[in-house]
């Protein structure tokens, strides 16, 4: 999708959280749009949106790292095994798993 159009869609006040959830999961969305979703407080309250952003390899790493601390343990474990996300994201997810489980994860 065109970046300008995608950014306009995200800024539309009538967009639903379900629509944003689907956009956050799309791998063709420009990373600027994913960054915009990640820093939006309204969308940050929705766990599914945050999880989709964390799983999306196009989400900027800085945004993903701040999201990881809010994810549940089982989702972090899945991220440590996900070859679609960057190595840095997998390592940070593993650090958080180890911190929460006392190093047993």
Residue ranges and their predicted role:
Residues 1-105:
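Alpha-helical scaffold segments
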């Amino acid at each position: 999708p065109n970046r300008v159009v995608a950014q306009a869609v995200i800024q539309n006040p009538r967009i639903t959280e379900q629509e944003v959830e689907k956009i956050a999961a799309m791998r063709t969305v420009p990373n600027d749009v994913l960054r915009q979703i990640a820093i939006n407080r309204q969308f940050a309250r929705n766990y599914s949106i945050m999880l989709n952003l964390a799983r999306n390899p196009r989400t900027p790493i800085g945004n993903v790292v701040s999201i990881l601390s809010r994810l549940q343990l089982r989702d972090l474990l899945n991220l440590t095994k996900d070859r679609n996300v960057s190595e840095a994201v997998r390592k940070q997810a593993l650090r958080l798993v180890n911190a929460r489980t006392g190093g047993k994860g």
